[in-house]
Amino acid sequence: MADETTTDTPDVQDEDAPDEDAPQTPDDTASDSTGEAAAADTDADAPDENAPDEDAPDAAPQDKDDGDDAPEESSSEEETSHRVTIEELLKAGAHFGHLTSRWNPRMEKYIFMERNNIHIIDLMQSQVLLDEAAEAAKRFARRGKKILFAGTKKQAEDIVREHAEECGMPHMVDRWLGGTMTNFQTIRKSIRRMEEIERMDRDGTLDKLKKKEKLMRLREHEKLEETLGGIRDMANLPSAIYIVDVQREDIAVSEANNLGIPIIAMVDTNGNPKNIDYPIPVNDDALSSIELVTSTLTDAVQEGLQERRMKKEEKKKAAA
């Protein structure tokens, strides 16, 4: 089925990669702040066909489910409330899309209007779809499954790393290595090589090497750590993947699709929502927008993990 903007005032987004389905023109238009009011007033409902089936099975050949968790009914509170308000989305600049000349036609149903050659995203749909993505992330965590966080664009790196580590999930933020999931065993060999160099350093083996050879080993380790350090503890394929920018991380999207791994992703107006299980139509370039979406998903993961811990404690008490 998947650069740089200011943090405070949402602006027209720089393109990381050209969209294959749309013509390209230079980004030279400033966003009109009146788009905020227009996006806030919309009463469009999220199309039912975009909402993923909550009861759909999680993709198989990844983390093993220990059978601890059974499907649960959504609470009435979850059904009637939203994790993020329209005002919060507006403040984060989540409604600002790209230049109309750079859009992907498949995003048309998520676009509220056009203003000054900029597409404005329908935040009513963004709000609902973010809720659905968060509930999916919560379910994965509650069942003891791993979600790989992926965001290699500069403004996403620190945010993705911080939140992934906060909830104990693997992450890739330096660059996406082709075959990270489809050639996972080779990736694991590289991780074992990194760990081998670390052992050599601890036991003094590196000190016995010639200075030049030792330096080469240390540089090799540094490179491996930068690229693979975030997934060193990921012993199996993830059960799901969260992607910040499907346009940039197109290889990750392709690999997940090939393996049947569910995708949760931020999709901007230049992106392709096709084959994304849980698309979140939002600005994927603004720091504030990336932070809002990623922190919301992280909170959901932590809720799932907490419910899992509580359930295990209840079982222990019942067995005592």
Swiss-Prot record:
Alphabetic keyword roster: Ribonucleoprotein, Ribosomal protein
Q: Does the keyword Ribosomal protein apply?
A: yes
Which parts of this chain are annotated as the region Disordered?
A: 1-83
Which InterPro entries did the record assign? Ribosomal_uS2, Ribosomal_uS2_bac/mit/plastid, Ribosomal_uS2_CS, Ribosomal_uS2_flav_dom_sf
Gene Ontology annotations for the cellular component aspect, listed alphabetically:
cytosolic small ribosomal subunit
Give me the stretches of Low complexity compositional bias: 27-41
* GO process terms (BP): translation
Q: Name one Pfam family in it.
A: Ribosomal_S2
Q: Which Gene3D superfamilies match?
A: Glucose-6-phosphate isomerase like protein, domain 1, Helix hairpin bin
Q: Which PROSITE patterns match?
A: RIBOSOMAL_S2_1 (PS00962)
- Gene Ontology terms, MF aspect: structural constituent of ribosome
Q: Where along the chain is composition biased (Acidic residues)?
A: 1-22, 42-57, 65-78
- Using the chain's own numbering, where are the disulfide bonds? none
Q: Which domain of life is it from?
A: Bacteria
Q: Does the keyword ATP-binding apply?
A: no
The family annotation for this protein states: Belongs to the universal ribosomal protein uS2 family.
Q: Tell me the PANTHER family matching this sequence.
A: 30S RIBOSOMAL PROTEIN S2 PROKARYOTIC AND ORGANELLAR, SMALL RIBOSOMAL SUBUNIT PROTEIN US2M
Name of the molecule in the record: Small ribosomal subunit protein uS2
